[in-house]
Regions:
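Catalytic grooves of carbohydrate-active enzymes
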Residues: 2, 11, 35-45, 190-239
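Metal-dependent polysaccharide deacetylase catalytic core of the NodB/CE4 family, i.e.
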Residues: 68, 72-146, 189-209, 237-239
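Alpha-helical packing segments of well-folded alpha/beta enzyme cores
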Residues: 47-58, 90, 123-131, 149, ...
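Catalytic domains of cell-wall/extracellular-matrix polysaccharide-remodeling enzymes
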Residues: 125-181
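Alpha-helical scaffolding within the catalytic cores
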Residues: 53-54, 82-95, 174-188, 218-227
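N-terminal regions that are enriched for targeting/export leaders
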Residues: 1-63
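A structural motif corresponding to the C-terminal end of an alpha-helix
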Residues: 48-67, 93-100, 133-137, 229-233
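A short acidic (Asp/Glu
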Residues: 16-19, 79-84, 114-116, 150-158, ...
């Protein structure tokens, strides 16, 4: 039986105001709250609400065959709490089915893993606490910002108790190996590594609407056929 591991990532940033020289030391209100609210509501109406509705339909239609993982940044949760609580509720409903795994991620969607291990650990712990507070779940799998990964990051994750990590299936890293298998960190071998299938993921994320692409238009049937024809299609991670 072939398995397809679906991962969706949700991040919303805070937007800053135009901050003038003469505001320094006088005005400490840095965020553009009107823009934050507008952007959150726009993406909620155009993306999150319809997508979550579709996901719930699929979960109900295929109770034994469909599940997925979800990585939501801490700032995304904060902004949804403030400006689109109905969206956060829809995420909670998905998670409550028991077939949506929450992944840990840096709280602020930062690249702390490349600069400071202490800050990296701090943001991971903050995020885990937020997921426990909002969704009532403990996270055991990690997805770094932009799927950045190195063996030393894997060691940190293992020390924090993670069982798995999701990362980019970069060709210069994998070489002749297929991304469609589960690997282990060579130092912390209890940490399992899932590599994103770069080609198939980008077919959906980047090339789907490109009318000049040789695979256009991409249909569900065509995509499924590509997966079946892949000689190394045991476990394909799409993110």
């Amino acid at each position: 039986m072939n398995s397809i591991c679906l991962n969706f990532r949700v991040h919303l940033p805070y937007y800053y105001k135009k901050y003038h020289f003469f505001d320094i030391g006088v005005n400490h209100d840095y965020y553009d709250t009107l823009r934050c609210e507008s952007e959150v509501k726009r993406v909620s109406e155009r993306c999150y609400l319809p997508a979550n509705k579709l996901m719930m339909t699929l979960l109900e239609r295929y109770p034994e065959r469909f599940s997925f993982s979800l990585a939501i940044s801490g700032t995304a949760v904060e902004l949804l709490e403030s400006y689109a609580p109905e969206v956060l509720e829809s995420f909670k409903e998905l998670v409550s089915t028991g077939r949506v795994e929450l992944l840990a991620t840096p709280y602020h969607h930062s690249l702390a893993s490349l600069q400071s291990s202490d800050e990296f650990k701090c943001q991971i712990n903050l995020h885990r606490e937020k997921m426990k507070e909002v969704f009532g779940l403990n996270t055991t799998t990690f997805a770094n910002t932009e799927m950045v990964y190195a063996d030393y990051i894997g060691v940190i994750l293992s020390e924090l108790g993670f069982k798995g990590v999701l990362t980019e299936g970069a060709k210069h890293v994998l070489g002749w190996r297929s991304p469609n298998y589960v690997y282990s960190n060579p130092i912390a071998q209890n940490l399992k590594i899932l590599f994103r299938n770069q080609s198939l993921s980008d077919d959906i994320a980047l090339r789907f609407t490109n009318s000049y692409w040789t695979g256009y238009p991409l249909t569900a049937e065509k995509f499924a056929d590509w997966i079946i024809r892949d000689p190394n299609h045991r476990s394909i991670t799409l993110a």
